[in-house]
Design a protein with these regions (language model features):
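Interdomain/boundary linker segments immediately adjacent to catalytic/signaling cores
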Residues: 1-75
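Domain-level recognition of nuclease-like catalytic cores that cleave nucleotide substrates
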Residues: 153-250
Length: 250
């Protein structure tokens, strides 16, 4: 492999982390209260939420947690492709479900990159197996006799390297080392990822406060009683009312 220039990694991260923060803000700007209210209302009732502001803050945090995991996962996957492009002429794969292909020490790697270990349900995992198998077949058709290794690469976590249903599962430090030959890369990328984080987060929190206030007002107008109490029945009806079972059981 070619030695990795960490300055290039820092430059890439500094330029592209901005997109992650911009997408965070955009996800807030495009959010509608009706989408937020699809979250589990029973959970918040069980937690004894009593004020509209507290409920909206909790719903918003739950939405952002899943949204940001996806957004940052995209960033990490792109970072992995960039690093492989520098160390071993890796490239973004055109095969469905495959993110990266690279060649090292006589082995052609086809890699599906995920951000964390809890990345998919059983049907999604079966689809991954199928995508990796198909990618191996495609490479073998163009490169007869090639040594091809399908890989599930996961950007963070401590799970040990293992063979799983025909592919190699590589996690955390081992994954970053696989694409760089640098055992310390997983910690080297921490500092540039935090580039201007405080500044970006302040802009995000400002937008979040605006959305929280706006949604709280809308929620009070639509889902609170004249006394000011949350109308939980009305909220659950909005969230889950869909009765049509009689059409199927009569």
């Amino acid at each position: 492999m070619n030695p990795l220039n960490l300055d290039q990694v820092r430059e890439y991260v500094n330029e592209n982390i901005v997109d992650f923060h911009q997408r965070r803000i955009r996800s807030l700007e495009e959010l509608e209260l009706r989408k937020l209210l699809t979250k589990n209302p029973y959970l918040f009732k069980a937690k004894n939420i009593a004020t509209a502001g507290e409920l909206i803050s909790g719903l918003l945090d739950a939405f952002l947690s899943s949204s940001e995991e996806k957004l940052f996962g995209d960033f990490l996957e792109h970072l992995a492709v960039f690093i492989a492009s520098k160390t071993c002429d890796g490239h973004k794969s055109t095969a469905p479900g495959i993110d990266l292909e690279f060649f090292n020490k006589g082995i052609h790697y086809v890699v599906s990159v995920k951000s964390g270990t809890s990345w998919g349900n059983s049907s999604q995992q079966k689809k991954l197996e199928e995508d990796l198998r198909n990618a191996v077949v495609r490479v073998r058709q163009s490169k007869r006799g090639a040594n091809i290794q399908p890989v599930l690469g996961i950007c963070y976590g401590k799970t040990r390297t293992s063979y799983v249903r025909g592919y190699l599962k590589v996690v955390g430090q081992n994954f970053w080392c696989l694409i760089s030959d640098n055992k310390d890369l997983y910690t080297d990328i921490i500092e540039p990822i935090g580039h201007r984080a405080k500044e970006h987060n302040e802009a995000f929190l400002f937008e979040k406060s605006r959305v929280t206030n706006r949604f709280t007002k809308l929620f009070i107008d639509g889902f609170c009683e004249d006394t000011g109490a949350i109308d939980w029945v009305k909220l659950v009806e909005f969230n889950s009312s869909n009765y049509d079972l009689d059409r199927f059981l009569s």
